[in-house]
């Protein structure tokens, strides 16, 4: 007996489940293409130092969640826990971080050692979008609206946009000094997890889920009060432009991103359709990341969407697959070759063609075609093969025959006319 099973926190995506995944991915990629965002693909495996420097050693991701190991060359390697650091590395390595501004996207598996739950696995899939070399407020607006539009296009309901500004590094440094002083006084009132964050990543305390700590934080200094005039002006312009675009938002001054490289704009999009407010998308500006990793000073902003949670949120209509256009029933040595030849020809018309490979009786093949709800059936026996022709039948919804025609395998004009008339009326061949 085979006792092998997938590891905890990993999931097999079976063919029926992947229909929904593929439909969701198709909609996302179409939206990105229409927004002139180009794909980039980076390795799943990177040097550990990349994430320590890019994400920050004090973050939960680096300190608790990474899958790290030594390879046979005694090099420390890590399965990527997120995609932005890898994109930044690729841009620096290939000398394209200094090129004119570019819009990039990636989609693929990431790895974090977390407690598995619905919509969150240890191997998970993430969509990331990065606008590299963009500094203007308008790039902040476009990245937010792009994320919003993708989620709306997928039919996600009850969307809420939360925004905040983290200021620049000077703003954050001034705030952090005041916040640390406040934490010293109030440390014992905080939950244990927040107490542990004080030395490593104090800003993450602002994002606590602990109810008691949330209440205590109401008396803490606000980062907003430490913003420079320039940072505040940028934030006010973003709010005004979102209002003009009629994109509703909520200001959340405790919203901080979990990674060290963020500056200025931070945002999350949540939904209440899962019973409580669940984050669907998170993003923000990270103007210092590329220089922090050894590249030139390069402004950038991006967002990420976890696909597992997105799939749960998407409606059942995205589970629908395209029906089989033609099922080819065939029996006999000569008929099999003709059927294979014909199936290849028909697929060039962007038709979904199922070629029966069973060699079973005609009646069994017809039953399978009916089960698949094929729009039409082609019948080829040795009698038809000798004449180099086939019979094609178009069916009604109740499986009764609508029309039937015999066509020569060499009569491309007649075949094309039949296809145009009966199967792809709305397509240009």
Curated annotation (Swiss-Prot):
EC number: 6.1.1.21
Name of protein: Histidine--tRNA ligase
Designated gene of the protein: hisS
Pfam family, any one: HGTP_anticodon
BP terms from Gene Ontology: histidyl-tRNA aminoacylation
Secretion signal span: none
Family: Belongs to the class-II aminoacyl-tRNA synthetase family.
Cited Gene3D superfamilies: Anticodon-binding domain, Bira Bifunctional Protein, Domain 2
Subcellular location, record wording: Cytoplasm
UniProt superkingdom: Bacteria
């Amino acid at each position: 007996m085979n006792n092998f099973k997938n590891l905890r926190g990993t999931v097999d995506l079976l063919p029926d489940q992947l229909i929904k995944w593929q439909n969701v991915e198709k909609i996302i990629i179409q939206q990105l293409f229409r927004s002139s965002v180009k794909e980039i693909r980076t390795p799943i495996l990177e040097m550990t130092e990349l994430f320590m420097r890019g994400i920050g050693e004090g973050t939960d991701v680096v300190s608790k969640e990474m899958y790290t190991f030594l390879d046979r060359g005694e090099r420390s390697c890590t399965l990527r826990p997120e995609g932005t650091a890898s994109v930044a590395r690729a841009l620096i390595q290939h000398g394209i971080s200094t090129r004119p501004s570019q819009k990039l996207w990636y989609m693929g598996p990431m790895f974090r050692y977390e407690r598995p739950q619905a919509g969150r696995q240890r191997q998970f899939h993430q969509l990331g979008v990065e606008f590299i070399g963009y500094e203007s407020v308008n790039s902040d607006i476009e990245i937010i609206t792009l994320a919003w539009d993708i989620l709306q296009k997928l039919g996600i309901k009850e969307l809420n946009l939360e925004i905040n500004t983290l200021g620049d590094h000077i703003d954050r440094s001034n705030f952090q000094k005041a916040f640390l002083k406040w934490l010293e006084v109030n440390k014992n009132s905080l939950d244990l997890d927040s107490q542990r964050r004080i030395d490593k990543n104090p800003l993450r305390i602002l994002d606590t889920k602990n109810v008691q700590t949330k209440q205590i934080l109401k008396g803490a200094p606000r980062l907003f009060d430490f913003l420079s005039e320039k940072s505040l002006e940028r934030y006010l312009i973003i709010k005004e432009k979102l209002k003009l675009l009629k994109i509703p938002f909520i200001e959340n001054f405790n919203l901080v991103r979990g990674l060290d490289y963020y500056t200025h704009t931070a945002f999350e999009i949540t939904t209440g359709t899962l019973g409580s407010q669940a984050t669907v998308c998170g993003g923000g500006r990270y103007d210092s990341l590329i220089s922090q990793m050894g590249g030139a000073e390069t402004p950038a902003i991006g967002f990420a969407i976890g696909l597992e949670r997105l799939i749960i949120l998407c409606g059942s209509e995205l589970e629908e697959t395209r029906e089989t256009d033609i099922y080819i029933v065939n029996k006999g040595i000569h008929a099999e070759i003709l059927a294979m030849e014909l199936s290849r020809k028909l697929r060039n018309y962007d038709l979904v063609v199922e070629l029966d490979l069973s060699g079973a009786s005609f009646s069994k093949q017809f039953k399978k075609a009916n089960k698949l709800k094929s729009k039409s059936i082609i019948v080829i026996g040795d009698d038809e093969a000798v004449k180099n022709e086939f019979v094609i039948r178009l069916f009604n919804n109740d499986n009764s025959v609508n029309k039937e025609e015999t066509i020569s395998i060499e009569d491309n004009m007649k075949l094309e006319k039949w296809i145009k008339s009966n199967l792809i009326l709305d397509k240009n061949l």
